[in-house]
């Protein structure tokens, strides 16, 4: 009976002192499609690139457009979703075409009077890059914008590359099912 506390203590100390693999922040880091530049930049080199982008289109703290330009990618235009390329438009407000004051790149709005690129919009484009964060809610317009961009690329014989981002809600799905009489987009 006097050995039991000693055995229990030895057992406890064994597991307290056992070497464990300590997970580092780097091992736990989630990589988005945009983060994996070595996989997609070779596909963009020498091509005229359009990108569907907004403020969520980042690699770390740098906007993907800035990052790609620094790497020599020829970005010929940006397509802007709801809220605009720089995110300075309120929800539901018409967003006009413009020239981005930071990069000088033409920005074509796909929210408001036009929701899909025209043949003319894609005439000087070889490949369209899509990188928008979605939140997994049906009222978010990004998934509808993606579907229309895919249609436009197919109709005009253009390549499209989608840089995926994980759903921040993970595996949680909740909420009412859409009543089809309220469907839009």
Q: Predicted segments — roles?
A:
Residues 1-27:
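Bacterial Sec-dependent N-terminal signal peptides
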Residues 25, 83-104:
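N-terminal beta-loop-helix "entrance" segment that forms/cooperates
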Residues 73, 155-159:
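A short helix->loop->beta-strand "cap" motif at the edges of active sites that frequently abuts
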Residues 74-84:
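Short internal beta-strands
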Residues 87-92, 161-184:
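Glycine-rich, charge-decorated loop segments at or immediately adjacent to ligand/cofactor-binding or catalytic sites
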Residues 95-125, 137:
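Glycine-rich oxoanion-binding loops at beta->alpha junctions
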Residues 134-146:
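Glycine/threonine-rich flexible loop motifs
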């Amino acid at each position: 009976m006097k050995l039991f506390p000693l055995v229990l203590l030895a057992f406890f100390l064994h597991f307290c002192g056992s070497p464990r693999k300590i997970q580092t922040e780097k091992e736990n880091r989630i990589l988005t499609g945009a983060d994996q530049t070595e996989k997609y930049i070779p596909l963009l080199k020498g091509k005229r690139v359009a990108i569907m982008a907004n403020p969520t289109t980042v690699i770390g703290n740098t906007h993907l457009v800035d990052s790609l330009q620094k790497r020599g990618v020829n970005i010929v235009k940006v397509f802007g979703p709801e809220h605009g390329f720089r995110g300075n438009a309120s929800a539901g407000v018409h967003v006009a075409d413009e020239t981005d004051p930071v990069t000088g790149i033409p920005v074509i709005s796909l929210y408001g009077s036009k929701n899909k690129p025209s043949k003319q919009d894609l005439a000087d484009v070889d490949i369209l890059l899509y990188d928008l964060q979605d939140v997994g809610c049906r009222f978010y317009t990004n998934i509808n914008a993606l579907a229309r961009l895919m249609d436009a690329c197919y109709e005009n014989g253009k390549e499209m590359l989608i840089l995926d981002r994980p759903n921040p809600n993970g595996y949680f799905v909740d909420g009412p099912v859409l009543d089809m009489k309220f469907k839009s987009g």
